[in-house]
A protein has these predicted regions:
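Juxta-kinase regulatory segment immediately upstream of eukaryotic protein kinase catalytic domains
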Residues: 24-58
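ATP/Mg2+ or Mg2+-diphosphate-binding catalytic cores
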Residues: 202, 320-369
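Active-site activation/catalytic loop segments of kinase-like enzymes and analogous catalytic loops
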Residues: 265-298, 312-330
Length: 369
C-alpha cells in the first residue's frame, strides 16, 4: 500500500551548465543525429488551422506546444473537443509515423488506458498533409489527455506507485503489437546509447564526462552481452514526468513519438531515471515505483540485474544530448530552454548512483527473484 508523502522540493534541484568556448555546432553525420538537430517544422498557425479544417473538419483556437521534432499545437475546437494537432518532422520516415498511429489504434482496441486517440480525416485516413516550399509533411490529430504533468507536482510515494502500475498496464497492452516501422532511427532509443560516444566531448564538465564515459562502457560490457536474454516488445520509451499526466489518482500517458521495439525492462529503467531524489535516500521513489510495476507486470531476475546500468545509460543519453543541444540549437530555441530547465539535474543524479553502486542498488530490488 502506498502512503501519501509530502512532495520533496529538492527534486527540482538544478546546477549550472556551460559549454566550452571552442565548441562548434556538429554537422549531423547520421540520420539519428539529424532527426533531432534540425528542429520542428515552422508552419504558421493560420496554415495549420486551414489544413486541419479542410481535412479533419475541426475549427477552433490554437496554442503552440514545445516539441523536439514535430510542430505541435493544442486545439480547442469550437464544438468542445480538445486535441493536439501535429505537423510531423520532415525527417521522420513514413513507416515510423505509421507505427506511432497504429500503436494508438492498437491501444484503443485494448481499452482501459488513458492515452491519446488517433483522429481520422473526413476521408477516413489516419494522416492529412500540409505543404510549403520545402515539400509535404504528414499532418495528424490526436485527442487531448487531461491532467497535470507529474513534473509540475513533485514526486511522492503515492504518485510513483500509481505511475509504476500504470506503466505496467501500458506495457502489457503493447505486448503482441508489431509493425514494420518498429525500429525507427532515434538517438533516444536506449539501444543506441553507444552511438553517443562521438558526442561526449561536448560535455564540458569533466566529472560528468567521466561518469558518462564509464556508464557507456558499463552498458557495452554488462548489458550488451545479455540483451538476447531479455524480453523484447514495443515500449513507450519516454515515460518522463513531462509525459505523465496525473488527474486525481489516474495516470495518463502522452507523446508516443519515441516508441520502439526494445527490451521491456528498458521502459522501466527510462522511467526510473527521472525519479530522482537528492536527499539522504536517493532511491526512495525508484523502489516503490519498481515494486508497483512488478506487482502488475512481473520482472525477472535477469531484468532486475541490468536495471542499474540501464538507468545510468538513460542518464548518459540525457546528459550527452543536453550538452550537445547547448551548441547545436540557438539559445532561444524553446525545446533547448525546456531541456535545460528540466534535465540539468541528470549529471548530479548519475554521480549519486555511481556512489551507491551496483550491488546496493540491486539489494533494494531484492523482491525481484
Amino acid at each position: 500500500m502506498c502512503n501519501r508523502a509530502r512532495p520533496n522540493p529538492n527534486n527540482d534541484a538544478v546546477y549550472s551548465l556551460s559549454i566550452n568556448s571552442d565548441t562548434h555546432v556538429m554537422k549531423p553525420e547520421s540520420a539519428t543525429l539529424a532527426a533531432i538537430s534540425v528542429g520542428a517544422p515552422t508552419f504558421s498557425q493560420e496554415a495549420v488551422s486551414r489544413a486541419i479544417e479542410a481535412q479533419f473538419g475541426l475549427i477552433g483556437e490554437y496554442s503552440p506546444l514545445v516539441s523536439e521534432r514535430d510542430q505541435n499545437f493544442m486545439l480547442r475546437a469550437d464544438d468542445g473537443g480538445h486535441f493536439v494537432a501535429k505537423v510531423t518532422s520532415g525527417l521522420e520516415e513514413a513507416a515510423a509515423t505509421d507505427f506511432q498511429v497504429e500503436a494508438l489504434l492498437h491501444l484503443e482496441v485494448k481499452g482501459g488506458l488513458n492515452v491519446p486517440r488517433a483522429v481520422r480525416t473526413k476521408a477516413g485516413e489516419t494522416f492529412g498533409e500540409i505543404s510549403d516550399d520545402n515539400g509535404s509533411y504528414r499532418l495528424r490529430v490526436v485527442t487531448w489527455v487531461d491532467g497535470e504533468p507529474l513534473e509540475s507536482q513533485g514526486l511522492n510515494e503515492r504518485s510513483v506507485c500509481n505511475f509504476g502500475a500504470a506503466l505496467a498496464r501500458l506495457d502489457k497492452a503493447f505486448a503482441g503489437y508489431t509493425h514494420p516501422g518498429e525500429n525507427p532511427a532515434l538517438l533516444w532509443d536506449l539501444q543506441r546509447v553507444l552511438e553517443l560516444r562521438e558526442l561526449i566531448d561536448y560535455i564540458s564538465d569533466s566529472s560528468a564526462r567521466k561518469s558518462v564515459t564509464q556508464a557507456a562502457d558499463d552498458f557495452e560490457n554488462r548489458v550488451l552481452p545479455v540483451l538476447g536474454d531479455l524480453r523484447y516488445q514495443v515500449i513507450h520509451s519516454d515515460a518522463n514526468p513531462g509525459n505523465i499526466l496525473l488527474a486525481d489518482d489516474r495516470i495518463g500517458f502522452i507523446d508516443f513519438g519515441d516508441i520502439v521495439k526494445a527490451p521491456l525492462v528498458f521502459d522501466v529503467a527510462i522511467a526510473m531515471s527521472y525519479l530522482r531524489s537528492f536527499d539522504a535516500n536517493p532511491l526512495k521513489f525508484m523502489v516503490p515505483f519498481v515494486a508497483a510495476y512488478h506487482a502488475v507486470n512481473p520482472l525477472d531476475a535477469r531484468e532486475a540485474d541490468v536495471l542499474f546500468d540501464l538507468v545510468r545509460a538513460r542518464l548518459t543519453t540525457t546528459i550527452t544530448l543536453l550538452y550537445w543541444r547547448l551548441s547545436a540549437r540557438a539559445e532561444n530555441d524553446a525545446y533547448r530552454q525546456k531541456a535545460l530547465e528540466v534535465e540539468s539535474g541528470a549529471g548530479r543524479f548519475l554521480a549519486i548512483l555511481d556512489s551507491i553502486g551496483r550491488s546496493e542498488f540491486r539489494e533494494k530490488l531484492a523482491f525481484i527473484q
